[in-house]
């Protein structure tokens, strides 16, 4: 008896990721899976789709992403990613986990169930990212274990605390071993590590890295046996500087990720489809670029049921009108064409922004003529450690002519009263201030401005909103975006969030000296992350990654660099 199947797609050029070639063949689909990729089969298809003149590639996979960086809830993010051909993501929910602990992770899992997008949760390994950061929760191995009972959980996310790994911290190693005990794996985070340090990470069981910024770094990690995720986010623009590390011989060790990408950039550029476009623009063959975007991400995360268009695989696929420009006609997820969705984010009420910061807390006396200053690196999350001449003063506020501004970090989770104050170069403000509750990874309040009063006004606005981002011109609020979900995510639609981000950027142009080549809001959010080089500010003060210790703002040393 002839078997009836749900669908056959004919006429297209179909990518075989195993041979890295396009084939003129058919795809037979039934019950959410591909049952054959042969042109002729003795099946009767209930639906026939003619894709003549088009290309079909596997659904794309984002191998490492923090959903919270989009600033929309998972159910909203899924709507956008599926439009861009992304059918699976491996996400590290450590942003909301740092704010709300297990409740934050569970919220993301629950809300993600509203989208057809497959969201594979890698449990956060470093909450807090370092013991001396003031976040909202602490998660030990024992806290994470019950989450492995949920099918969405697929391993351990990036282990960022190299020091804990190197000294054999019991809880850190338990988190890693738990991931393997449940049949999964553990992601690494090897920013700035040398070959010897990479071996320490590998011996602990960490088998991926997404922090490469150069060809040499990527090659070192491949030689060490790690899978490398080439990253293109809002700030982390690393695909073009690293794509030269990929060869036909080692290509299976590379996949693509976005890490941190705002919804506005996802809408204008794309997600992994943008990484593919960049790779091909740099000279990579389309067959290879689309393989990095699909099969390789699946292999890195041990997702054996996806990543190719072969029998037995999930029917996750992308139909393209234009191969080299990645022009997507439509996306299929588990055998169903993606259609517009009307779902709305689930409510979240687990946290409140709480602090009692006042103007006096922003005082920064400088008794000497030199200061340690954070230097912004445009479109990178690393910073420069600048040593700049500063006039002695009882309270430094801003030197707009030299683009040296005051920056503050206010603990917002437990109302401890901790406030870190430092200096930053690179934001080009001429007046006003900006503030936000997105501040990796502890997500305290972070602000930068030209006066203490402007900083306090911006802080007051986001406190009133129970989290968000604000731009003020002295006392006037020019734009604000409430982030009701833990101070990280908006409860609004992705379209509304994109509009609000555009308003924030327009407001920033009003108070800035010149147009910036980078996003000031997400850039500011990374100036508080102590596990990324070089100089960062936390609620406890200025932190030097090179010495892995806190340092004063005012110094006596010889001048290192001037502006």
UniProtKB/Swiss-Prot annotation:
GO terms, molecular function: adenine deaminase activity
InterPro entries from the UniProt entry: Adenine_deam (IPR006679), Adenine_deam_C (IPR026912), Amidohydro-rel (IPR006680), Metal-dep_hydrolase_composite (IPR011059), Metal_Hydrolase (IPR032466)
SUPFAM superfamilies per the UniProt record, alphabetical: Composite domain of metallo-dependent hydrolases, Metallo-dependent hydrolases
Record's keyword annotation contains Cell wall biogenesis/degradation: no
Cofactor(s) in the UniProt record: Mn(2+)
Pfam families per the UniProt record, alphabetical: Adenine_deam_C, Amidohydro_1
One BP annotation, GO: adenine catabolic process
UniProt keyword list: Hydrolase, Manganese
Catalytic activity: adenine + H2O + H(+) = hypoxanthine + NH4(+)
TM stretches of this protein: none
EC numbers: 3.5.4.2
Coiled coil start-end: none
Source organism, top-level taxon: Bacteria
Family to which this protein belongs: Belongs to the metallo-dependent hydrolases superfamily. Adenine deaminase family.
Record-given protein name: Adenine deaminase
Gene name as annotated: ade
């Amino acid at each position: 008896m002839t078997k009836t199947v749900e669908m056959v797609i004919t006429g297209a050029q179909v990518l075989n990721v195993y041979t890295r070639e396009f084939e003129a063949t058919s795809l037979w689909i039934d019950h959410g899976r591909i049952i054959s990729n042969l042109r002729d089969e003795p099946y009767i298809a209930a639906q026939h789709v003619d894709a003549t003149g088009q290309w079909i590639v596997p659904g794309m996979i984002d191998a490492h992403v923090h959903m919270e960086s989009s600033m929309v809830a998972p159910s909203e993010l899924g709507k956008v990613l599926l439009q861009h051909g992304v059918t699976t993501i491996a996400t590290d929910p450590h942003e909301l986990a740092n704010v709300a602990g297990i409740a934050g992770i569970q919220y993301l899992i629950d809300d993600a169930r509203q989208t057809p997008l497959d969201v594979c949760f890698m449990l956060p390994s470093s909450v807090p990212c370092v013991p001396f950061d003031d976040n909202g929760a602490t998660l030990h191995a024992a806290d994470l274990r019950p989450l492995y009972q949920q099918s969405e959980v697929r391993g351990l996310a990036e282990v960022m605390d190299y020091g804990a790994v190197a000294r054999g911290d019991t809880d850190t190693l338990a988190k890693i071993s738990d991931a393997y005990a449940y049949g999964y794996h553990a992601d690494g985070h090897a920013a700035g590590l040398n070959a010897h340090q990479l071996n320490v990470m590998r011996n602990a069981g960490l088998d991926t890295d997404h922090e490469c910024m150069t060809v040499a770094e990527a090659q070192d990690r491949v030689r060490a046996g790690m899978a490398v995720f080439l990253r293109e986010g809002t700030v982390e623009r690393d695909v073009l500087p690293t794509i030269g590390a990929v060869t036909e011989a080692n290509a299976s060790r590379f996949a693509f990720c976005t890490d941190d990408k705002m919804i506005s950039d996802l809408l204008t550029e794309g997600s992994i489809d943008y990484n593919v476009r960049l790779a091909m623009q740099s000279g990579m063959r389309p067959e290879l670029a689309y393989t990095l975007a699909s099969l390789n991400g699946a292999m890195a995360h041990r997702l054996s049921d996806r990543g190719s268009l072969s029998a037995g695989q999930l029917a996750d696929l992308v139909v393209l009108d234009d191969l080299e420009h990645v022009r997507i006609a439509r996306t299929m997820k588990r055998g169903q064409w993606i259609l517009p969705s009307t779902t709305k984010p689930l409510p979240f009420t687990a946290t409140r922004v709480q602090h009692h910061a006042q103007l006096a807390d922003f005082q920064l006396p400088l008794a000497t003529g030199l200061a340690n200053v954070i230097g912004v690196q445009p479109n990178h999350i690393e910073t420069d450690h600048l040593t700049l001449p500063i006039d002695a003063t009882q309270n430094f506020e801003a030197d707009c002519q030299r683009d040296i501004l005051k920056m503050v970090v206010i603990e917002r989770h437990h109302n401890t009263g901790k406030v870190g104050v430092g200096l930053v170069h690179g934001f080009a403000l001429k007046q006003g201030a900006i503030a936000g509750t997105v501040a990796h990874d502890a997500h305290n309040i972070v602000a930068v401005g030209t006066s203490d009063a402007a900083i306090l006004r911006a802080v007051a606005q986001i406190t009133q909103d129970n989290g968000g981002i604000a731009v003020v011109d002295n006392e006037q609020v020019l734009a604000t975006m409430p982030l009701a979900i833990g101070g990280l995510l908006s409860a609004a639609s992705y379209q509304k969030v994109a509009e609000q981000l555009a308003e924030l950027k327009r407001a920033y142009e009003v108070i800035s000296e010149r147009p910036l080549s980078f996003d000031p809001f997400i850039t500011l959010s990374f100036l508080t992350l102590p596990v990324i080089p070089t100089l960062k500010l936390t609620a406890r003060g200025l932190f030097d990654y090179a010495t892995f210790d806190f340092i004063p703002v005012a110094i006596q040393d010889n001048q290192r660099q001037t502006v």
